[in-house]
């Protein structure tokens, strides 16, 4: 049956209801970032997933500008000839003057056009450009900081390209240049210094100083007003980088951040209040069947179980059907990503499960790339033993089946004592002997280069989670990105996430947080914090996040010990859920995916571009932001199946398929009633109504969006236009609509 999704977020609060699409015929958008076709971090995901939505809006007038890397071009880019004579003349002019500029199509969804600048080929001009940067912006870059030097080269090449492109056009187009992060920020500063007619936007996905300060175990968010930013940046030897970032934020026509929590941070550290908050989204896959993602979960979980069977050979004394898989993934920042809190909570969870005699087992995965030199021999041996046991079992099964077939064929019952011969028993005994081992299953799947000082391994030694038989919580540290070609765990990241039961991301510093967002889109419950952009976004858009499988951990107003206790409580309550309750919760989690779709969140970027055009070209574009009436906002209400707690929810159909559910005695009660997921989804869609947006009538007043000044404007002014305050989804939310 087709999956009908809620239209609850077809219009987000604080953004104008555009009735007329913006006409980009004489406007060109360049999106500049170091991670264009060059995977380094999360910005790559932002650009990759947003490309289709932006391309649909701008068409062939949308270009991405990034650095040329041989690996990236070979695997991700199809080199092409420039499609317009102006662009071809621009590239030819730059190449004739000693630069190397490439043009092509990024082979991702949407297929955006890309301009790639070879920074290495322009190193001959580095010292001259660094001198010009000092004369123009008073920013000095030390010779030893290669990343900052690359940023200088990339910035000057970007400015050169934009200036040359404008010069080659007889009819000057309206150019919007959107720069992401400090590595691209030098180009923005130079565009303004050279007075290029370009509307500029700067988006910071995380502040440099914020990341360094949070890693230093300081009470960051409660002391934002007290930091001496110049002193702190200087002590960490990143003052020149900080100056690049701050200069870009102040030079931009429009300054944006990815979350409200980062907006507060940027206001204090970069000394400019963001004009608008642009949350990160994802491309949401629409499932054709109601329970398709549940089937994918079961298939992926089976792949993980195969790995667990091999990893814990000889100590597989727990029931895999009563085993939950938790995971944390991301950049290896032990404190910033909350790995310290997660480990402490796992130790406490292990104690609770043991003293309460729980039959539930938890396997916690840490997917964080670290320095290794090879696979752990014991881990490889475990997978080899598992495969050998499987081959042995298949051999015995074939011989048994053949003898049984021959016996039945002649019309006699087989003699079970003769079905297996001595050779078969010897083979099976050898297989059993191969599973014997004296040591505990390894905690780490690889050999670490810094085993004695590694933060995760050091903490595991302190809390004593060694994967012993008595432990109900097992820990597996996989210090490498997941790959479907791995000899250990041959699954890619998406398949691994689908197979797990819970993602745990108790980050202290997380400007947005793509990992919990990806969990939500895949229908996997997750734990986030009120210090992450994703956690704040969901907390402010959902009346009861935990009912939808979004657990928000308080790390801002609680001590570290209290946060650990709260996380332990979340984990323990999740372990107490039955399979039926987890199915219901996953259904609810997956229904939130529309809230994270670029189809809706892309409108924040649209609003930022309109604002930049109005500021850069005030004679041709107008933009009048209006305050938002709180009554126009909305929040996802509690699920229609009241009460919202999964522990009290009714059965998920079909009831007979829940073989793990405990038998119940007595007459049917409320908890034993049939739970119809399709019916509950329909109730949610009725309850989660889109707000009624006022229609705009024609008038001579200017609109709240950026339009040509000679276009017919509308009135009365919509109360849903972008406010002057930093636009977060939180700033205009009303109460829950019933």
Residue ranges and their predicted role:
Residues 1-738:
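Catalytic cores of nucleotide-sugar-dependent glycosyltransferases that transfer UDP/GDP/TDP-activated
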């Amino acid at each position: 049956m087709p999956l009908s999704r809620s239209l609850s977020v077809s219009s987000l609060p604080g953004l104008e209801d555009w009735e007329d699409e913006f006409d980009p015929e004489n406007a060109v958008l360049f999106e500049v970032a170091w991670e264009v076709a060059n995977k380094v971090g999360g910005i790559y995901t932002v650009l990759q997933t947003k490309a289709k939505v932006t391309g649909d809006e701008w068409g062939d007038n949308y270009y991405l500008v990034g650095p040329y890397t041989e690996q990236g071009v070979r695997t991700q880019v199809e080199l092409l000839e420039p499609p317009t004579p102006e662009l071809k003349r621009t590239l030819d002019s730059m190449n004739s003057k000693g630069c190397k500029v490439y043009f092509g199509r990024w082979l991702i969804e949407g297929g955006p056009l890309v301009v790639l600048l070879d920074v290495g080929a322009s190193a001959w001009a580095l010292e001259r450009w660094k001198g010009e940067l000092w004369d123009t912006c008073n920013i000095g870059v030390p010779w030893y900081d290669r990343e900052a030097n690359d940023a200088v080269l990339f910035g000057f090449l970007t400015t050169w390209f934009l200036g040359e492109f404008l010069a080659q056009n007889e009819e000057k187009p309206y150019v919007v240049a959107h720069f992401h992060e400090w590595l691209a920020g030098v180009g923005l500063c130079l565009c303004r210094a050279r007075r290029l007619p370009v509307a500029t936007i700067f988006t910071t996905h995380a502040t440099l100083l914020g990341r360094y300060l949070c890693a230093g175990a300081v009470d960051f968010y409660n002391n934002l007003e007290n930091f001496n930013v110049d002193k702190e940046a200087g002590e960490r030897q990143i003052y020149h980088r900080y100056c690049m970032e701050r200069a870009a934020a102040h030079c931009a026509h429009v300054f944006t951040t990815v979350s409200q929590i980062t907006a507060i941070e940027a206001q204090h550290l970069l000394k400019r209040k963001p004009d608008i908050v642009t949350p990160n989204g994802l491309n949401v896959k629409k499932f054709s069947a109601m329970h398709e993602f549940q089937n994918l979960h079961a298939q992926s979980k089976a792949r993980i179980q195969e790995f667990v069977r091999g990893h814990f050979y000889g100590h597989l004394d727990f029931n895999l059907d009563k085993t939950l898989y938790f995971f944390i993934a991301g950049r290896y920042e032990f404190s910033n990503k909350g790995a310290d809190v997660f480990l402490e909570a796992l130790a406490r969870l292990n104690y609770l499960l043991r003293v309460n005699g729980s039959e539930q087992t938890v396997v916690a995965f840490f997917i964080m790339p670290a320095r290794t030199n090879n696979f752990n021999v014991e881990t490889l041996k475990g997978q080899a033993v598992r495969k050998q046991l499987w081959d042995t079992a298949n051999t015995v099964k074939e011989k048994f089946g053949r003898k049984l077939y021959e016996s039945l064929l002649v019309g006699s019952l087989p003699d079970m004592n003769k079905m297996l011969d001595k050779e078969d028993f010897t083979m099976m005994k050898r297989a059993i002997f191969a599973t014997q081992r004296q040591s505990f299953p390894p905690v780490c799947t690889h050999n670490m280069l810094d085993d004695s000082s590694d933060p995760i391994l050091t903490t595991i030694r302190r809390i004593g989670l060694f994967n012993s038989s008595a432990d109900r919580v097992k820990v597996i540290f996989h210090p490498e990105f997941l790959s479907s070609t791995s000899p250990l765990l041959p699954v890619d990241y998406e398949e691994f996430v689908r197979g797990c039961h819970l993602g745990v991301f108790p980050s202290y510093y997380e400007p947005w947080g793509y990992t919990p967002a990806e969990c939500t889109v895949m229908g996997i419950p997750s734990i986030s914090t009120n210090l992450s952009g994703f956690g704040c976004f969901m907390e402010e858009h959902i009346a009861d996040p935990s009912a939808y499988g979004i657990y928000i951990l308080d790390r801002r107003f609680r001590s570290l010990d209290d946060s650990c206790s709260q996380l332990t409580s979340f984990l323990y309550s999740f372990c107490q859920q039955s399979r039926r309750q987890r199915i219901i919760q996953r259904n609810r989690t997956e229904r939130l995916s529309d809230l994270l779709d670029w189809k809706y969140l892309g409108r924040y970027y649209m609003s930022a571009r309109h604002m930049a055009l109005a500021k850069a070209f005030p004679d041709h574009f107008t933009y009048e932001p209006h305050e938002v009436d709180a009554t126009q906002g909305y929040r996802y209400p509690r699920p229609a199946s009241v009460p919202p707690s999964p522990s009290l929810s009714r059965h998920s159909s079909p009831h007979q398929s829940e073989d793990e559910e405990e038998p119940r005695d007595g007459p049917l009660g409320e908890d034993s009633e049939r739970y119809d997921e399709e019916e509950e989804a329909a109730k949610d869609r009725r309850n989660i109504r889109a707000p009624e947006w006022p229609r705009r009538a024609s008038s001579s007043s200017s609109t709240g969006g950026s339009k040509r000044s000679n276009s017919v404007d509308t009135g009365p002014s919509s109360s849903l236009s972008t406010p002057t305050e930093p636009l977060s989804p939180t700033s205009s939310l009303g109460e829950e609509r019933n």
